[in-house]
Design a protein with these regions (language model features):
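Residue-level detector of alpha-helix initiation sites
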Residues: 66, 130-132, 155
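N-terminal Rossmann-like FAD-binding beta1-loop-alpha1 element of flavoenzymes
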Residues: 123-148
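Ferredoxin-type iron-sulfur electron-transfer modules and their immediate structural context
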Residues: 1-123, 171, 210-236
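Short low-complexity, flexible loop/linker segments enriched in glycine and/or proline
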Residues: 162-166, 204-208, 226-228
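Rossmann-like dinucleotide-binding cores of NAD(P)H-dependent redox enzymes
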Residues: 146-149, 153-190
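Short amphipathic alpha-helical segments
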Residues: 138-139, 161-162, 222-226
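Short, well-ordered alpha-helices that flank and scaffold nucleotide-derived cofactor binding pockets
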Residues: 103, 138, 142, 237
Length: 237
């Protein structure tokens, strides 16, 4: 089970009220700034939470992020490190607010399949079912394409499922989102490994486009002094 206890709604709204005391929101990943990598409109949905407009906050949050329940739990939160309140105080608890928004959206049934009735008849293959592959699948399906996701493991999710422990993010969050994506028309094929069960040239013939979202499972070594010391392991081990 996740070890983080959700904050009460009033505490979340109080935290959201601390936002926008800055002239320039450094929490955005603007040119020259190192804030949110996906450009979440953080001040906007913080203000909506402060006003109690949770459903609109969810729409705003999902406009830039397909899976805020994932990032709200496991993202290192460069937005909080960039918050200008760090100069005089602690930053706004942006991750906690993000989690609260999406969790409340699920609880209230605001997150529903978005099905495009106008199909393009284009067939798209996606290799890998991690967050990048799933986000691409969802967006392309909503654009009207026929999308098939191929995953070497039996279950979908990539490192979200096989690399993130339950105490940081429970698998129910992945399964719930997969149900939504499947309802939107995306097909999933597990136990299919590229280069073993299927060749890339065959996939290229079968699809109008193929996306490689295989992830970064192979660690990168560092040729630096002290690398051979005891107790140093790859993060992927």
């Amino acid at each position: 089970k996740e070890f983080i206890v959700p904050l009460p709604e009033q505490v979340i709204r109080d935290q959201a009220s601390r936002c926008m005391e800055c002239g320039i929101p450094f929490c955005h990943d603007m040119k020259g700034l190192k804030g949110c990598p996906v450009n979440n409109q953080i001040p906007d949905w913080n203000d909506l939470v402060y006003r109690g407009e949770w459903e609109q906050a969810s729409k705003d949050l999902h406009s830039t992020n397909n899976f805020p329940e994932f990032t709200g739990r496991i993202c290192p939160a460069p937005c909080e490190a960039s918050c200008t309140l760090n100069i005089v105080d602690s930053p706004v608890t942006i991750k906690s607010i993000e989690c609260s928004i999406v969790d409340k959206a699920w609880e209230n049934g605001w997150i529903k399949p978005q099905i495009n009735q106008k199909k393009t008849d284009k067939r798209i293959g996606i290799i890998g079912s991690g967050p990048a592959g799933l986000a691409a699948a969802q967006q392309l399906s909503r654009a009207g394409h026929n999308v098939i996701v191929y995953e070497k493991n039996k279950k979908m999710g990539g490192l979200l499922r096989y690399g993130i422990p339950d105490f940081k993010m429970e698998k129910t969050h992945i399964d719930r989102r997969l149900e939504q994506i499947s309802a939107e028309g995306v097909q999933f094929q597990g136990g299919v490994e590229l280069g073993v069960d299927v060749e890339i040239n065959d996939l290229l013939k079968q699809h109008d486009a193929v996306i490689l979202a295989c992830g970064a499972e192979k660690p990168r070594d560092l040729d630096i002094d002290g690398r051979n010391a005891e107790g140093i392991h790859y993060a992927m081990d």
